[in-house]
Amino acid sequence: MLWVMGSSARNPYVIATRALDGDAEHGGLLFRINCAGCHGIAGQGLVGPSLRGVSSRLSDPQIIHQVVSGETPPMPRFDVEPQEMADLLAHLKSFTADT
């Protein structure tokens, strides 16, 4: 995966990801394997911040950038194909502020 500097909304990876239909169920599996250790199984936050309501705080391009960039340690860079990122994004959108 190549992350191109500049506006994340114009990034080819972001464009490819957003063009896909995400599978929230598969995204949940990816989340449990890769993210829940720090963000909690329900996105409530542990070592990492709460992800409840994240899609109301950040745009899709911002969320994608946050996940794949590795620019905010201690969160590692998550190197996934656009379909997997679309799936994860669909799952993250299920975390409403009151879940």
Summary of predicted features, one role per range:
Residues 1-3:
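Non-ligating segments of multi-cofactor redox enzymes
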Residues 5-30, 99:
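Electrostatic cytochrome c docking/interface patches
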Residues 6-7, 33-37, 60-61:
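Short hydrophobic/aromatic-rich motifs at helix boundaries and adjacent loops
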Residues 12, 25-29, 49-54, 64:
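Short linear motifs at secondary-structure transitions and domain/linker junctions
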Residues 20-41, 65-69:
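Sequence/structural segment immediately N-terminal to covalent heme-attachment motifs in c-type
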Residues 42, 46, 52-99:
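Extracytoplasmic electron-transfer domains, predominantly the class I c-type cytochrome c fold
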